[in-house]
Structure formats: C-alpha cells, structure tokens
Amino acid sequence: MAEVVENTENTENETPAVPQMSTVERAEMLLEQDATIREKIKSGATLDEAVDPSNKEFGPLAHPEQVQMRVAKRAMMLEAGIAPYPVHLDVTDTIEAVRAKYDGKLEAGEETEDMVGIAGRVLFLRNAGGLCFVQLSAGDGTKIQGMISKKEIGADSLKQFKQLVDLGDHLYLKGRVIASKTGELSVFATEWAIASKALQPLPALHKDLNEDTRTRKPYIGMIADENIRNMVRNRSKAVASLRRTFDDHDFLEVETPMLQTLHGGAAARPFTTHMNAFDLDLYLRIAPELFLKRCLVGGIDRVFEINRDFRNEGVDATHAPEFTMVEAYQAYGTHDSIGQLVKELVQKTAMDVYGSHKVTLLDGTEYDFGGEWKTISMYDSLSEALGEEIVPNGGPEHPGTSVEHLGAIADKLGVERDDVENHGKLVEHLWEHFYEDKLYEPTFVRDFPVETSPLVKGHRTKPGVVEKWDLYVRGFELATGYSELNDPIVQRERFVAQAKDALAGDEEACDIDEDFLEALGVGMPPAGGMGMGIDRLLIALTGATIRETITFPLVKPLVG
C-alpha cells in the first residue's frame, strides 16, 4: 500500500480559488440552494439543520449562513401558510402620527384603549422571556417601541414571533397605545405579521457606514444614516421650491429631447448611442439650451426645464457624468435681470428647505446666502492678479493680449494648457488658477471671452467679451447666465469657429446646427438665460460632495 504523504508546506496565507461563474450561472445556483433549503424545511428539518454554514454543497459564491437562515425562515412561513410578502395589511396609522399624538401625553405605565395599526422596519429586537421588545422605524427615521406579550397574543404566536422575526424585517403591529414602565411610548400588540421578510442582514447601524457601502448600496445608507435620508428629502424640497418660484414668475415648464442628432448648448464631450430603428448615431444631450430657445422662437416667452444632462468627462467632488440641471430663458430679459432671478431662486430655496438664508453645512459651519452678492470682472480681476493689463480679443479692430503672451504666462505659472488653444481658453485657465477656488461668498463673475461662449450676445460696450456671468459659491461654479445671442448671422460665425476647433481636435466644440440657425432666422426675441446644476445647488446648501447629493450615483462596477 502506498504511503500517504502529508503536505507540510505553510498554506496559512493561501486563499482558496473562487470558481468563475457567469451572472446567470450564479443566479441559477442560488435558486437551487433556495430550493434545497425549502425541501429540507418541508421534510421537517429545523432551521439549524436546513442551513450549510460552510457551503460545502454549493461553494463560496453561495448564500452565506445568515442569508441561508433567513431563506429557511421564509420557507418555514410558506409551509405554515403565512405569506412572507403579503399584499395588504391593515396599516391605519403612521409611526409619525402616533408619535405626534401621544408623545409627552402619557405617564410611565399609563395605558390607553386606543387601537392603532402601524408598520416599520425592525431595527432592534429583544427577547425577555414572555415579553419581546422591538423598535420599528418609519421611512423618515421616526421610531417607536413595540411590545409583544405571551399574555396578549398567546404562547404559540409568541414562539412563532421569536422564531421568524429578524432585524431588518418590515413588521406590522396592531395594538393599544401605552407608555412602558420606563415611560417609553409603545404599541402593545394584539396582532403581528411580517410585512416583508428581509433576506439580507443589515450592517451594524451603530457604526458609521464605509464609503463603499454608501455609494454602492445607497438603500442601506438611507436606512442607516439620517443625513442621507435628509439629503433625499431636501433635494425634493429644493426642486419643488425652484418650480414654485418659476411658476410665480409665469414660466412654463417643458421637456426637450434627451437623444439628439447633434450635440450642442454647452462645451463638453458627449456620450454617444445608436438608434437601431433609424440606423442613426445619436448623442445624449449635454444641455437643453438650443431646444428651449426654439420655444422662445415659437412664442413661449418664459420657459424652463429641470432634467438630466450627460457629459462624458471627469468625475470629482463637483462633477458627475449624469446630473440634473435647471435651464430657463426669458424673452426681453438680459444677463442682469436673469442674475436677479437666480439670486431669488437660490435664496428662496434656502428659505424653503432650511427656513433661513443662513444654512448650516455638514461640517458644522454656517454659510449666508442673504444680502447683496458681490460682482467682479474676469479681465479686471485677472489683470490685477498678474500685475499687467490683459485685454480682450476684439478682433482686427480691437486686438487683445496675444495667444503667445498668454501662453507664456501660463507656462511660467505652471497652468495646464489645452491641445487646442485660443485667447479665451487661456484667459479662463489663468483666471481659474488665481480665483476659482477662492471665491467663497456668493460672487457673480462677468465679462467672459467671446471665444468660449458661442451662444452668448457680445457685450454692448466691451469688444471681445460677452454678456455672461458665472455665479461662484464656496469656491465652485454654481450657475451661469447670459444675454442670449439671437442674430443668426453672428451665430453662424460662432458655430463655424467652433467647428474649426473641432476639426483641430477639440472634442468639446459644438456642431453646426443648421435647424437651430433656421429657427433663429424666423426670429428669436432678445432674451436672458440661465443654467444651474441641481446637484451643485445641494452642494452649496449642504457642503456635501456631488456624489452625496445624487440618490443613486454612478459607481464603477467591481471586477470579479
């Protein structure tokens, strides 16, 4: 008989190989594991007998032990004829309403005969023999204690409660409103039912969630973190406030195409897609501007849209590839009048969400949106920072500071330069180097170069600049506003200049939109326009990052 030789090498740090499975293969394997657990329960196995803690049968990609146990409880409910996900329960009261009605009204140990039917997620569970305590949480985080007594519901029902209910389950309780002996407002149950069986255990709610869980599983964050729930609610309040203010000023809300045959309305790299029915390449819009201006041509004198835009660019604390914008256009307005509108929009939103122009940021500091807002000129402020005059490029009759000189300044300062450069881009890069992250109080920055603003009307008295402002708050751009270009000949000239930049390799340059030029030819009234990121508005109001303001941010998938 051959000798068996034991492997004496140190394998302590070796990780067992995880089998490779497709998504479908793993899903089928998990269903097979679920069915196996149910068959064991059907055959009379106990909960402990139904689970396989080491996953010997199904391997490391199968359900972990805690999930198996919950799957077994679901199977046990089905075998007992109990729906783990019932269609309807007699929920007659919200936890918030019960709290509002009875908080502070009952003495310790006082009982009422008032019956309520409530439901919430189980966040705490304690077994005290013949009496069980649960803490139920409503969606807004309001909590209440439930008491389940053997005396009230019977031994069998209490045994079933102890056996089936887990943390994270949605639980229905019907019972009397009382105050416990310690004075805790409670519902003393006469009936209970699982409203939705949670198969996945919750993380420890007394610990801070790590960033990966917050971003990859936002629904867990909503359960665990009051700040995340508040962000969702405050975002909704902010959007509602914006709509009210626009409505107060007789603006009409419209929806414009997300899929576009040309990309335009902003300088940004677009996402592309393909429409099979027309065999047509399309762009996800980077801005709704050109369609909203068509509304002005059509006689809708005050128009706005709150919707998604998509830009295939970098991701950081204030930029996301998919984001929500509000854009608005007002016939016979200017960049000055639209600036006053934006100030009103921001201040009213702060009041509607927080009750004050002065808001408290997540780091505990206060920020004041009230009072008058500062205004500076891009060229004047850049000249001051450099100690020399930087002159706008007004064309052959009003030549400005040369591209060569601006480039030399940029190189000396170590300012990043684009592959395709012009006077306007260099001026903006230099200005951003000195000022962008330093404008803390609300500040309108005016007088932008004509080269970087192809859809904006030229300044009435300053050659080479346009009637545009950017609003900076806490060191980042919050909104932008214009006196809109409505001369179709000048607009064609601007489009041609952009097209030449595109041919030279500028991926952010706009296409020539002949249909839009034809619309301008029909006649667009003089107008002011604005754009503001909803996500950035929440950043300004809260101090959060853009990812924290988006309920379901895009996250790079995990590999493997």
Question: Predicted segment positions?
Answer:
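Class II aminoacyl-tRNA synthetase catalytic cores and aaRS-like
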Residues: 1-560
